[in-house]
UniProtKB/Swiss-Prot annotation:
It is a multi-pass membrane protein. This is Proton extrusion protein PxcA. The chain crosses the membrane at residues 203-223, 298-318, 345-365, 381-401. It holds the Pfam family CemA. Required for H(+) efflux immediately after light irradiation to form a rapid H(+) concentration gradient across the thylakoid membranes. Together with PxcL, contributes to transient H(+) uptake following dark to light transition. One of its GO terms (molecular function) is proton transmembrane transporter activity. Residues 124-153 are annotated as: Disordered. Belongs to the CemA family. Residues 125-144 have a biased composition (Polar residues). Its main location: membrane. Keywords: Cell inner membrane, Cell membrane, Hydrogen ion transport, Ion transport, Membrane, Transmembrane, Transmembrane helix, Transport. It is found in: Cell inner membrane. GO terms for cellular component: plasma membrane.
Amino acid sequence: MAFFAGISDWVAQRLQRNSETARLDLERAYEAALYITALETEYASGRSLRRLPSQLSARQQTSLQAELRQTLRSLRHYRQRYRRHQPVQLQAGLALGRPGMGMPTIAHEKLQLIEQVLARYGQPTVHSSNPDDSQLMTSKNNSKPVPDPESDDEYLISQTSFLPRSIFGAFADLRQQLDPKAEDQIVQNFRSRKGKTLIALRFVLLLVLVPLLTQQISKSFIVGPIVDRLRSQDPEAIFLNFQMEEEAFVKLNQYQQLLRFQHYLKEAPPLTEAEIDERVREKAEEIAVEYRQESSNAIKNIFADLISAAAFAILLISSQEEIQLLKSFIDEVVYGISDSAKAFIIILFTDIFVGFHSPHGWEVILESISRHFGIPENRSFIFLFIATFPVILDTIFKYWIFRYLNRISPSAVATYRNMNE
């Protein structure tokens, strides 16, 4: 009895390990399919990338083709590993167009997306001696067709074998581990991804530092001296707008009332009217200097920000390759996040920018921008902006979910709806 119990435990552990391996392979294949779908949406408006866009340069086309070929190779590899480790009755559900016995609906949706992506690019040649040398743009004569879901019997027969599929999976894993070129391939892939990641992070750092440094340097050494010299020629130009003048008047009036209040409470030595006028005049001069500097600072901000925006635009125009690497890096990071984390991030950002409390945040942002450029605050414009812009932003976001996210990640959309409810 102990012998049979040991065999039963070994079989159960083997099945559990195969199930976990199949789950990981499915997730990796699904991430590769999502990445290819994102490339199609970005470069070909959702169509296949068999024909690369003509507006891309030759170098960009080569880089995109290599990236697509590598991702397709990974997709086919993990899809094949998944088929080896997954029981046959679960794969039958995909061939019949419905979930198999014990297959979750989300896993079935992922398999459908994987098969749809592979169907758009065909299958690699069966007799190829080196799969790494297979071209991405293969013709129908040189590619193995994707199984037709309608031919159920033929598909199931082709997927069955005399020995259990897990045995072939174990031998395939062992052969891959004993391959003398496997370590070099892993190191090469790691170095390639590491280089792309460093370039993407360095470019993000440049996108942040270049505008900030340009704004500060131009404001301190170029725009600042010019504005100070021009405004010194007109001593009467103190206030940039009427709102600053009103604020200065309120401050001066409060100071005058404070002096009289302290005099009445006898907290300060008694002052004559002449002494009160003298102190008020000194305070007025301090306020005038303060608002003259604030007005000059607002003018400096306008020209310094224009120079900073020009530097940012030049950086974007001259860094097209870095932008492509940054997009690939962002896609890998985003598609590597779980569906629940994606839904959480989406809900967080939507509640911040278009949620119930977002009008207060938009009001603070608009007031800060107005003060930064020395523009008088227009309450009517602020309320009109708050009443229209978040609504437009919410409409764009819902359209993006309907057209884009619902197609590449239906499980994330389902999780988002459940969490939002």
